[in-house]
């Protein structure tokens, strides 16, 4: 019986601790309207699970904040989009997460919804790797 309890608690600990908020590699599609096509760029972003709860009874003294896996530190990198017209700005700057945390999503700098276009969305039909 003790071994079953140990296995249960170990699995719970593993699920909580090891699937936390951490850096992950992603590929995003970047585009410049003047260039008329997209390129794929590898970067890092935050993904994982954060402990959160939704209270049954609302308490005005304790605001209900849903925690999400989001960046703590960012740097920005710049890539040149090939094929742009000579007069067009061909540089594209994108964020790269360097540290993650479980916290409130900042809607001023982040798309906090599930309705975003997604990292592989391209307005144009041609994507260059």
UniProtKB/Swiss-Prot annotation:
What would be an example GO MF term here?
A: follicle-stimulating hormone activity
Please provide, in alphabetical order, the Gene Ontology terms of the cellular component aspect for this entry. Answer: cytoplasm; extracellular space; follicle-stimulating hormone complex
Share an example GO biological-process annotation for this protein: G protein-coupled receptor signaling pathway
Residue positions with a glycan: 25, 42
Q: Which InterPro entries match?
A: Cystine-knot_cytokine, Glyco_hormone_CN, Gonadotropin_bsu, Gonadotropin_bsu_CS
Q: Where in the cell is it found?
A: Secreted
> Where is the signal peptide, in residue numbers?
1-18
Keywords from the UniProt entry? Disulfide bond, Glycoprotein, Hormone, Secreted, Signal
Source species, domain of life? Eukaryota
* SUPFAM superfamilies recorded: Cystine-knot cytokines
Which cysteines pair up through disulfides? They are 21-69, 35-84, 38-122, 46-100, 50-102, 105-112
Keyword Signal listed: yes
Report the family membership.
Answer: Belongs to the glycoprotein hormones subunit beta family.
Q: What does this protein do?
A: Together with the alpha chain CGA constitutes follitropin, the follicle-stimulating hormone, and provides its biological specificity to the hormone heterodimer. Binds FSHR, a G protein-coupled receptor, on target cells to activate downstream signaling pathways. Follitropin is involved in follicle development and spermatogenesis in reproductive organs.
The protein's assembly and partners? Heterodimer. The active follitropin is a heterodimer composed of an alpha chain/CGA shared with other hormones and a unique beta chain/FSHB shown here.
Specify the protein name. Follitropin subunit beta
Native organism: Cavia porcellus
């Amino acid at each position: 019986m003790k071994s079953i309890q140990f296995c249960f608690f170990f699995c719970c600990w593993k699920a909580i601790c090891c699937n936390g908020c951490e850096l992950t590699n992603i590929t995003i599609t970047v585009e410049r309207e003047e260039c008329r096509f997209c390129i794929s760029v590898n970067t890092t972003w935050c993904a994982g699970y954060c402990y959160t709860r939704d209270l049954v009874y609302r308490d005005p003294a304790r605001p209900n904040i849903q925690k999400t896996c989001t960046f703590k530190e960012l740097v920005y990198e710049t890539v040149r989009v090939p094929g742009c017209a000579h007069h067009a700005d061909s540089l594209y700057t994108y964020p790269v997460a360097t540290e993650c945390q479980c916290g409130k999503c900042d809607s001023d700098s982040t798309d906090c919804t599930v309705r975003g276009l997604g990292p592989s969305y391209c307005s144009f039909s041609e994507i260059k790797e």
